[in-house]
Amino acid sequence: MKIFICEDDPKQRENMVTIIKNYIMIEEKPMEIALATDNPYEVLEQAKNMNDIGCYFLDIQLSTDINGIKLGSEIRKHDPVGNIIFVTSHSELTYLTFVYKVAAMDFIFKDDPAELRTRIIDCLETAHTRLQLLSKDNSVETIELKRGSNSVYVQYDDIMFFESSTKSHRLIAHLDNRQIEFYGNLKELSQLDDRFFRCHNSFVVNRHNIESIDSKERIVYFKNKEHCYASVRNVKKK
């Protein structure tokens, strides 16, 4: 998958490049940064010649005669199922996506560096999963984790367990190498398929990713070295 960045702030652009390059290297994803620029017309020209699905990180306010949302609208004409993510400091401009009818994957706000990194990675994960779903391999099972204004798609095989959050109506998905907080309930998750089992009031585990169980201490250990607890009556059921 080719990734395009259009950001007119050089420092912000370089920061995004670093985040994405590190992610690709560490996770060994089949992705590459095809272009990082402040020129929207360079991105549009690349989109016109795309044979595959692209992933576009677009600053909304650009120092040119075209803004990021208009750019996204033009990209849609050439890459109708591409992943478009808007990066901005101005939340009040998000309404323009409805004006231009751009189906954006996410809106990422620049103000919080930690959140910026997390959301970029979430978008890359979701873009990768979408690409797999659109490829010939339709056997990959995924779940949509709703986070409010956006969703993250993750594969069943990447899930270690789900945990109740301290925040109302929210859960935490423990994946192979990260955690995602989302809206949901454990009862529904335990019914996804036979691999998911509610071992405790606060946990639903993925049986396929269990490494070992300490029946005496009622602790479930997973392949990624995390653990959770099981109730007495559910230890033997697993």
Curated annotation (Swiss-Prot):
Q: Where in the cell is it found?
A: Cytoplasm
Locate the coiled-coil region(s) and give their ranges. none
Going by the UniProt record, its keywords in alphabetical order are: Activator, Cytoplasm, DNA-binding, Phosphoprotein, Transcription, Transcription regulation, Two-component regulatory system
CDD domains, alphabetized: REC_LytTR_AgrA-like
Residue span, HTH LytTR-type domain = 143-238
Q: Which InterPro entries match?
A: CheY-like_superfamily, LytR-like, LytTR_DNA-bd_dom, Sig_transdc_resp-reg_receiver
| One MF term in the entry's GO annotations | DNA binding
4-aspartylphosphate (modified residue): where? 59
**PROSITE patterns registered for this protein in UniProt:** HTH_LYTTR (PS50930), RESPONSE_REGULATORY (PS50110)
Keyword Endoplasmic reticulum assigned: no
Q: Where is the Response regulatory domain?
A: 2-125
Identify the domain of life. Bacteria
Entry function: Required for high-level post-exponential phase expression of a series of secreted proteins.
NCBIfam families reported in the protein's UniProt record: quorum_RR_AgrA
Q: What is this protein called?
A: Accessory gene regulator A
